[in-house]
A protein has these predicted regions:
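Repeated scaffold domains used in trafficking and secretory/extracellular systems
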Residues: 1-4, 10-14, 43-59, 99, ...
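Short beta-strand elements that form the blades of beta-propeller/WD-repeat-like
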Residues: 6-17, 24-25, 57-65, 118-123, ...
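Structural motif
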Residues: 16-26, 67-77, 126-132, 175-182
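Short loop/turn segments that connect beta-strands within beta-propeller blades
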Residues: 28-31, 79-81, 133-136, 185-188
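A short beta-strand motif characteristic of beta-propeller blades
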Residues: 33-41, 90-103, 139-148, 190-196
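Polar, enzyme-active/binding microenvironments
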Residues: 67-69, 80-84, 88-104, 116, ...
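Intrinsically disordered, low-complexity segments enriched in Gly and acidic/Ser/Thr residues
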Residues: 124-125, 129, 133-134, 139-172, ...
Length: 210
């Protein structure tokens, strides 16, 4: 979901159609079928991951163009869909750039966004990378941090409500109890705590505030 600048609730939801390489959007209060936006921008692409940034005002997407294997980072304003025609604001692409091989992105990367900030996190095996959307095409060339051992693979990441902590779930196929959980400080990128090999194979991680 994303918000509009003058709203304090989610304005719309976005969906990606891998079969047609298209981004769909729909206002929360709208019960009609989601409509394609930015038609032609993602033709031939499949989604690696997407999320809202900049206090949920904009969307960032990482896609893979299947014909060339090129990964693209697309930063967009998703638009405003009012029932009043004079208040509608069209979606637009802020930038779309190819991600270099040195950026660490791969098919199967977990992609998550710090919604209140301008940062998109993505993974490669047990490594976590971070891209600030304000940096445009200046992608990281080294991991922000690595999690656990090289035999572990990150399967999910989730943030605390204030985005100051990131919880990273991994699986280690070489362990009898493969699932581990790590907590990192997003301000310092330091490990706060870890709980290694505490469960079976992790499929998804969820955060619940006490």
């Amino acid at each position: 979901p994303w918000w509009r600048d003058d709203l304090f609730y989610a304005h719309g939801d976005a969906y990606f159609d891998n079969a047609h390489g298209s981004l769909l959007a729909m206002a929360i209060e709208n019960t009609s079928v989601p409509a394609e936006i930015l038609k032609g921008t993602f033709t031939g692409d499949t989604l690696v991951g997407m999320g809202s940034v900049n206090k949920q005002r904009n969307l960032a997407l990482i896609t893979n163009q299947t014909s060339t294997g090129t990964f693209y980072f697309t930063y967009i304003f998703p638009g405003y869909y009012s029932s009043s025609a004079d208040k509608r604001i069209a979606a637009n692409v802020l930038y779309r750039v190819a991600m270099p091989s040195t950026s660490g992105i791969a098919n199967g990367s977990v992609v998550r966004s710090a919604r209140s900030k301008n940062i998109v996190y993505y993974t490669n095996d047990n490594a976590v990378y971070a891209h600030n959307v304000l940096a445009n095409s200046n992608f990281p060339t080294a991991a922000l941090f690595t999690v656990g051992s090289s035999s572990e693979k990150i399967v999910d990441m989730v943030f605390s409500d204030d985005d100051n902590l990131i919880y990273v779930a991994t699986n280690d196929t070489s362990a009898s109890m493969p699932g581990s959980l790590y907590c990192y400080d997003t301000q310092t990128n330091a490990l706060r705590w870890s709980k290694q090999h505490i469960t079976g194979r992790i499929v998804k991680a969820l955060f619940r505030n006490k």
